[in-house]
Amino acid sequence: MKWLRLQDLPTDNSFAALPAEFYTRLQPRPPAAPRLLHANAEAAALIGLDPAEFSTQAFLDVFSGHAPLPGGDTLAAVYSGHQFGVWAGQLGDGRAHLLGEVRGPAGGWELQLKGAGMTPYSRMGDGRAVLRSSVREYLASEAMHGLGIPTTRSLALVVSDDPVMRETVETAAVVTRMAPSFVRFGSFEHWSARRQPEQLRVLADYVIDRFYPECRVAGAGRLDGEHGEILGLLAAVTRRTALLMADWQAVGFCHGVMNTDNMSILGLTLDYGPYGFMDTFQLGHICNHSDSEGRYAWNRQPSVGLWNLYRLASSLHTLAPDPEALRAVLDGYEAVFTQAFHGRMAGKLGLPQFLPEDETLLDDLLQLMHQQGADFTLAFRRLGEAVRGQRQPFEDLFIDRAAAGAWYDRLAARHASDGRAAQARAAAMDEVNPLYVLRNHLAEQAIRAAARGDAGEIDILLKLLRNPYKQQPGYDAYAGLAPDWAAGLEVSCSS
């Protein structure tokens, strides 16, 4: 790979080429005296940026918001959306600044600062992000990528001593996020709600041409009928969203704020706020302290994904005024999700395929884990040990070890029906059952270290989370049960 200096990155600011109504051009108002806490060489490689640039003043200036991206076009985008099921009207990038788009070896990547100051869309916000939430977002995107789940990426984390008032006084930070696009469901809702079909068409054409060109081609992504391109777009987004929900469920991930303005049109995990990877398994686990009704609980995420797709379809109705055709596309969501989820869970259980009778086997395990407070990640990981003949670590996760053992006997009988060798089965299970996930207490340890100016915990976590399925000697503490003090940790929308 040919490494490039920051000033030599090739830019292609495609979103900025849209009509002016889609955004506001502006300059960030970043925190004072910024310091680079961490930069991500893996993300830099996506745009061909030489990691040697991390130590330059130019890198700090650009990714703190004190200087523009060379060749970029800084702006904040407008969008609308439903928040907690209620129409919230116009929203937009209230503390995010799109610096520009870079053409890298892996395609185009938009670079966006989060926390670099107010925009016309800040509403009652101050445009700031705090250290706590910025460390969590920086780590989460890389953790999800390591798990193989579609996500935005993190490039840089800059900190400042500027005070920021939240529930308490915290300090400011700026995180640089990367994605092929930050267009959301709410981007389409905005123009639909404003009854501006011309802008809606411009946005749809932009998304199709840039990311779903197959929707222009009959027999590829374009569906039959007069509005085949728009229906094809909805079908593609529906499929990606269903697959994303299956990914989340399979690793015990809760997003926490599945508002339509946080739903990526590309099926990426977007906007890491009060997210969480489950420790003790609960079917109705709520990771967001602000979600008092449990709208975005773990077991509701797939249905919320579909609800959000209905809002997207409603916004596309002007371009494809055929309710039955739109509904027919959305009717395909459940089958895609179920097949994908069952496929992922079959792998986690060591099954070559998911048969109808396996539904009961899986449901009984989840109910047992729920009733007995078993750890989600370790319960599945230790199934591989049980297959190797070491059942006790799995059974020890349950209060009623006999009940866990009885369930495992049923799984072992199911395994016997396909005749696969135990070692090969266990190895395959380890490849889909992570050992390391970004538990809240691990993120908290990294936050506390970062507050002292120490990025060492971030380094350790990135090392582990980039290879979450492979045991790495010397890091047992990062793969164990959450400590008792972790039960008191709460995350909310306050960041």
UniProtKB/Swiss-Prot annotation:
GO terms for molecular function: AMPylase activity; ATP binding; magnesium ion binding. Mg(2+) binds at N262, D271. Transmembrane segments: none annotated. The keyword ATP-binding applies. HAMAP family: YdiU_SelO. Belongs to the SELO family. Nucleotidyltransferase involved in the post-translational modification of proteins. It can catalyze the addition of adenosine monophosphate (AMP) or uridine monophosphate (UMP) to a protein, resulting in modifications known as AMPylation and UMPylation. NCBIfam families: PRK00029.1. This is Protein nucleotidyltransferase YdiU. It comes from Bordetella parapertussis (strain 12822 / ATCC BAA-587 / NCTC 13253).
